[in-house]
Structures are given as structure tokens and as C-alpha cells.
Swiss-Prot record:
GO biological process: L-lyxose metabolic process; rhamnose catabolic process
InterPro entries named among the record's database cross-references: L-rhamnose_isomerase (IPR050337), Rhamnose_isomerase (IPR009308), Xyl_isomerase-like_sf (IPR036237)
Principal location: cytoplasm
Identification of the protein by name: L-rhamnose isomerase
SUPFAM superfamilies, alphabetized: Xylose isomerase-like (SSF51658)
Alphabetized UniProt keyword annotations: Cytoplasm, Isomerase, Manganese, Metal-binding, Rhamnose metabolism
Organism for this UniProt entry: Escherichia coli O81 (strain ED1a)
Alphabetized GO MF terms: L-rhamnose isomerase activity; manganese ion binding
Residues reported to bind Mn(2+): 262, 294, 296
Subunit details: Homotetramer.
Subcellular location: Cytoplasm
């Protein structure tokens, strides 16, 4: 540890102690908050089922930066490189299309054995795993419908895929000793004016009930459902709307997924957390950065990311909110994208933990909104960066932008050879 870092740390401890904050306790609490990194940043959501196939479901990864992962070994190597540069606890979020098999496997036939390598890798790296059925980029999703499809045969295929995915998820939780959160998102919707908005939702309701009918150990598996305002090709009608899934999660007591890019541009999920928590047992967050639409840009340390983190910390939702990331940018180094976004999420959590929330609550309750605003703004100038640097030091990760040199070296020695 350098003398400069030690001095900055000691000064930061004093400054935060003056406003009633124990920085050591803040770092202990930060280690209670894993962030689930999404596997699909490394290969632009291609997966291993049909890597050359088209990406459908209204999903777009724009850009053509060299070095995308082409197989599971490359993806795991990229993840390891990124994780070495991110301090604190992490998880990995997998989609079903990232299975490994020597022969083609129909999505309704996926089994735990197809993800055995991921589990062994997670054990070796002390990670938890989360999961998602992949209801897109498939011939049976080509017309824009899956679990709400009017064709019984096609709808049953997707029901069976989600059922099989739940068993994979439970396998993750059983093997790793931490529950896997399995999130169901479907692209179902219509491009133009829709006459019958009810029937697809009735079918989706029945389909979801069948999907979750098998009782699984909640210590191993958690069901979550995710809404979306619209998607490309589904601009006029989305079957799985916010109202639909809030009602479903409330009535079935599943987790509800809130994606930062899945609402109107004037809405923010930070404002939805406290409302939804009154009705659902758990929340899954997909922290992203929508630019005019659900563009899934790399997460910044911006106002909304900070507000999301503050909601979790202020209301002590550590055990009820699962923090996941969902962005994919193919225009920049993909490992750097992971590192930037995940470090920013963790920085936001740390800043929230360094807030004098008890004092702010007192001011708010007393109606002293002047002091509340003043204290909130002055808090931004306190030396949280020194606390972050100590956290990185303790987790043997770079504290500042020097991590970029590691990424550049990896790009030169590994990524550049992929073509």
C-alpha cells in the first residue's frame, strides 16, 4: 500500500466519521452485495446453439469491434480477465443458448448436463450463477410470439423450454449453494394496431402458470418475470407489459424484474423499487443505460445508477433485491465494457453506503427540505474515491484507470488473434 493511498484513506475516514459514517462498516456491507454480470456482453448475444444465426426478438448489438468470444472457453477466459479487474463479490448470468453440447440440443430438451462446465467453472471461481430461458433467435419465435402463441404446439414448445430452464436453474443453486434467479423475458407483441389484446395475455397467463407448476426448492431457484414497454417489431403492443407482470408477480409471489431500459424514457426504475416491494417478495434489477430507447448502453455512474443503488441501501433491501446488469456494446472492447459497467454499479453502491441516511431521514421528517438538499449535495464532495481505492486495494484489483492497460494487453495477446 502506498503512502499516498494510506494518507487519503485516513483523511477519508475522518471526513466521513464527521458525518456519522463508519467507512469500514460500509466496506463490509458492500461485500454483501454481489453484482450478476451478464455473459452476453462478450459475444453480442450470439450464444453457442447457432452462433451464425440472426439475433431476433427486437434485440440489437451494434458495432463490430474485433475479438468477440466464439466458444465457451473464450467466453470464460474473457470473464476471468474482466472479473480480475472488478473488486468484490460477483455472479454470472447465463442464457440458455450458452449451453455446451457435442450434438444439437432442442431448447425444450436442455438439461443440467449441458451446463456442467459452467457449474465447475463457477465453483472454481467462487461464483453464483443465474439463468434465463432464451425465447428469441429461433425458428419458432420468428413470427414474434412464444409463450403467448396462438398455435398450441409452438406455445407448448416454449413452455417446455422454460420448464427445462427452471430445472437447470435449480441445478445451479443446488450445486453452488446460492439460489439461481431465473428470469423469463419474451419478445411477444405486434408491430401495428392490435385488435385482440386480451387473448394473448390470457394464453401467457396460463402458460406461465404451467411453467412454474413444478415446485422447486426456493433455496436453489427463484422465478422472476420481466416486462417491456415495446421492442423493435413490437412497437404497438407488448403482451408482457408492466401491468401484466406486476399483477402476475404479485398474485403468484414470484420475483419481478425491473429493467432500466424497458419503460418509457421519462420513467426510471429507481422510483419503482419501493412501490413494487410492497407487493412482491423479491426484485431482480437489470441495470442498463437506455439512450432514447432500450439501447443497452454500458452502465455509467450517472444519476439513475446512483438512485437505484441508493434505493437498495436506504431501505435495506440487500436480501430482497438481486442486482444484475444488462447491456451489450459491440462498438468497444467488450471486456472493457464489462469492467466499466460493473465497477460503476459497485461505485454507486459504495456511495450509497457512505450516505448519512439516518440524518437525512430526520431532516425530511422535520420538514427541513433546505438542509436535506444541502446535505445531499455536500455529500457528493466527500472523498468517497479514497474509500473506493482502498476497497480495490483489499480485493487486489486496480483502483483507477490502470485497469485499462490490463485490457489492452489482453486485447493484443488474445483478442487480436480471434479475427
Amino acid at each position: 500500500m502506498t503512502t499516498q493511498l494510506e494518507q487519503a484513506w485516513e483523511l477519508a475516514k475522518q471526513r466521513f466519521a464527521a458525518v456519522g459514517i463508519d467507512v469500514e462498516e460500509a466496506l463490509r456491507q458492500l461485500d454483501r452485495l454481489p453484482v450478476s454480470m451478464h455473459c452476453w456482453q462478450s459475444d453480442d448475444v450470439s450464444g453457442f446453439e447457432n452462433p451464425e444465426g440472426l439475433l431476433t426478438g427486437g434485440i440489437q448489438a451494434t458495432g463490430n469491434y474485433p475479438g468477440k468470444a466464439r466458444n465457451a472457453s473464450e467466453l470464460r477466459a474473457d470473464l476471468e480477465q474482466a472479473m480480475r479487474l472488478i473488486p468484490g463479490p460477483k455472479r454470472l448470468n447465463l442464457h440458455a443458448i450458452y449451453l455446451e453440447s457435442d450434438t444439437p440440443v432442442s431448447r425444450d430438451q436442455i438439461k443440467p448436463e449441458h451446463f456442467k462446465n459452467w457449474v465447475e467453472w463457477a465453483k472454481a471461481n467462487q461464483l453464483g450463477l443465474d439463468f434465463n430461458p432464451s425465447c428469441f433467435s429461433h425458428p419458432l419465435s420468428a413470427d414474434g410470439f412464444t409463450l403467448s402463441h396462438a398455435d398450441d404446439r409452438i406455445r407448448q414448445f416454449w413452455i417446455d423450454h422454460c420448464k427445462a430452464s427452471r430445472r437447470v436453474s435449480a441445478y445451479f443453486g443446488e450445486q453452488l449453494g446460492t439460489p439461481s434467479v431465473m428470469n423469463i423475458w419474451i419478445p411477444d407483441g405486434m408491430k401495428d394496431i392490435t385488435v385482440d389484446r386480451l387473448a394473448p395475455r390470457q394464453r401467457l397467463l396460463a402458460a406461465l402458470d404451467e411453467v412454474i407448476s413444478e415446485k422447486l426448492n426456493p433455496a436453489h431457484h427463484i422465478d422472476a418475470v420481466e416486462s417491456k414497454l415495446f421492442g423493435i417489431g413490437a412497437e404497438s403492443y407488448t403482451v408482457g407489459s408492466n401491468e401484466f407482470y406486476l399483477g402476475y408477480a404479485t398474485s403468484r409471489q414470484t420475483a419481478l424484474c425491473l429493467d432500466a431500459g424497458h419503460f418509457h424514457p421519462t420513467e426510471v426504475i429507481s422510483d419503482k423499487i419501493s412501490a413494487a416491494m410492497l407487493y412482491v417478495p423479491q426484485l431482480l434489477l437489470h441495470v442498463s443505460r437506455p439512450v432514447r430507447w432500450d439501447s443497452d448502453h454500458v452502465v455509467l455512474l450517472d444519476d439513475e445508477t446512483q438512485a437505484i443503488a441508493s434505493e437498495i441501501v436506504r431501505h435495506d433491501l440487500f436480501d430482497q433485491v438481486h442486482i444484475g446488469l444488462d447491456f451489450f456494446d459491440a462498438s468497444i472492447n467488450r471486456i472493457a465494457a464489462w469492467v466499466i459497467g460493473t465497477r460503476n454499479m459497485k461505485k454507486a453502491l459504495l456511495r450509497a453506503l457512505l450516505e448519512p441516511t439516518a440524518e437525512l431521514r430526520k431532516l425530511e421528517a422535520a420538514g427541513d427540505y433546505t438542509a436535506r438538499l444541502a446535505l445531499l449535495e455536500e455529500q457528493k464532495s466527500l472523498p468517497w474515491q479514497a474509500v473506493w481505492e482502498m476497497y480495490c486495494q483489499r480485493h487486489d484489483t486496480p483502483a483507477g484507470s490502470e485497469w485499462l492497460e490490463n485490457v489492452r494487453t489482453y486485447e493484443k495477446e488474445i483478442l487480436s488473434r480471434r479475427g
